[in-house]
């Protein structure tokens, strides 16, 4: 809910924070109605601050803030924050997965560009991660990646060849690549899917309940395994350099 100079009771999640002064932080938050927003959280680092235990990542919040800031119209001023409740903080691999999603949103979302449907999908994914559903984490991540790319206009149609717009040939396999879109697989190429599989994903993405429909399709182990490197490469292409920190950290941990 918003007035001319204030936004009240806005559903939000903290994506990232960094120091602003000895006692204050700048928060990058994902809000339902206003997209990614930067907020100055004054005094939040003080031990007596009521905001300090509330402003955590991967927790559903209700925020109030005044529009504009001191010398920077892009930075607004936090006035109130409440934990909405509903689930605990994800742990272990689920926590790392959640921080990975946050980094994607930080890299790919412009400020003050609303994505209400994407916000709702993100909130649902965070609830799954908080539930520690180990086997569900990978297909849930692939589903979010697909919907994020489609929402931002970075995912081509998956029922036709991107270069020719020709329908996918039955029985043929295809690869999704950053600069060429969906193309016929090369000989020996492993991270690929068949035409019917790509068509099923496209149909799911266009369904009314796109998240549930897409999750049902990519929950098959073969689908999730083949999609992972293709989607990660496409996301990294649009995120630019350097490599996503969360991905690098996960790679480092796996090598220990």
Curated annotation (Swiss-Prot):
PANTHER family reported for this sequence: DNA REPAIR PROTEIN RECO
GO CC annotation: bacterial nucleoid
Annotated keywords: DNA damage, DNA recombination, DNA repair
Keyword Flavoprotein included in the entry's annotation: no
Function as written in the Swiss-Prot or TrEMBL entry: Involved in DNA repair and RecF pathway recombination.
Pfam entry (one): RecO_C
Stored SUPFAM superfamilies: ArfGap/RecO-like zinc finger, Nucleic acid-binding proteins
Gene: recO
Organism ancestry: Bacteria, Pseudomonadati, Pseudomonadota, Betaproteobacteria, Burkholderiales
The name this protein goes by in its record: DNA repair protein RecO
GO biological process: DNA recombination; double-strand break repair
Family: Belongs to the RecO family.
Protein origin, superkingdom: Bacteria
